[in-house]
Amino acid sequence: MAKPSYVKFEVPQELAEKALEAVEIARDTGRIRKGTNETTKAVERGQAKLVIIAEDVDPEEIVAHLPPLCEEKEIPYVYVPSKKELGAAAGLEVPAASVAIIEPGKARELVEDIAMKVKELMK
């Protein structure tokens, strides 16, 4: 299946798994924002340290604004294959189209590592 139009670069499986792990750790030891509305607000306010976007969001328009907004605000973002997995990592029983890590907590080094790898992928 073709990637949705809002997916601007290919994310290796290992990096996607690290992003989900970072969400879980930040959920427990820091602060996250769950869902596209909360994520958008966190990006607009410059609070997000890392934005995680699911690749299987339908309709695409729900999250299509996030990559350009993150680029404008210079906030790193990464894709994960499944909104169901992203929701679970965020501690939800429902899928989440996107999540923003506000305070990484004990995931700080992991978030910094992901941000660095994402910069390489975007070149």
UniProtKB/Swiss-Prot annotation:
Cell cycle keyword on record: no
This protein's UniProt keywords: Cytoplasm, Ribonucleoprotein, Ribosomal protein, RNA-binding, rRNA-binding, tRNA processing
Pfam families found in the cross-reference section: Ribosomal_L7Ae
Top-rank taxon, per record: Archaea
Localization in the cell: Cytoplasm
Family note: Belongs to the eukaryotic ribosomal protein eL8 family.
HAMAP family in alphabetical order: Ribosomal_eL8
Its biological purpose: Multifunctional RNA-binding protein that recognizes the K-turn motif in ribosomal RNA, the RNA component of RNase P, box H/ACA, box C/D and box C'/D' sRNAs.
Protein name: Large ribosomal subunit protein eL8
Species whose genome carries this gene: Thermococcus kodakarensis (strain ATCC BAA-918 / JCM 12380 / KOD1)
